[in-house]
Regions:
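Ubiquitin-like/PB1-type beta-grasp interaction modules and other compact soluble beta-rich domains
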Residues: 1-129
């Protein structure tokens, strides 16, 4: 089953969309994050564009308006990015909505349909203090 993943801002503006393939309609939150991150890293590594527009910043990357700019064009380690993304989820760096219901635990099982709306909403830390 193909399912559409959207990156959204808090106001609902979609900033990125792509599809992933699921072999089952029931997945854990952890599996969903892993599949999403792996897909975006594979897409980046196949093209090596100037900017990486993914869920979490790769090592040695600078945040810019266009995404994360790596100091040199290089292949990103997908396994490492998955680990960083799972950690960010647990630390509320982003949250996931499936059909407008927030997912809260990595082990939570989710039943998806081809029409399910999956949104990853990245939280931007406040600057200052």
């Amino acid at each position: 089953m193909q399912i559409l993943i959207s990156d959204e801002l808090l106001n609902g503006t979609v900033t990125n969309q792509f599809e992933i393939h699921l072999s089952s309609n029931i997945v854990s939150v952890k599996e969903l994050i892993k599949m999403r991150v792996t897909k975006e890293i594979e897409a980046y590594n196949n093209r090596l564009p100037e900017y990486f527009n993914g869920l979490v910043a790769p090592t040695d990357a600078e945040r810019t308006l266009n995404g994360f700019k790596l100091k040199s064009k290089q292949v990103i380690d997908a396994e490492k990015q998955v680990y960083v993304a799972l950690d960010a989820f647990q630390k509320n760096g982003f949250f996931i909505l499936v059909d407008n219901q927030q997912l809260e635990d990595l082990d939570e099982m989710v039943r998806l349909q081809s029409t399910s709306k999956i949104s990853f909403v990245k939280l931007t830390p406040l600057i200052g203090g």
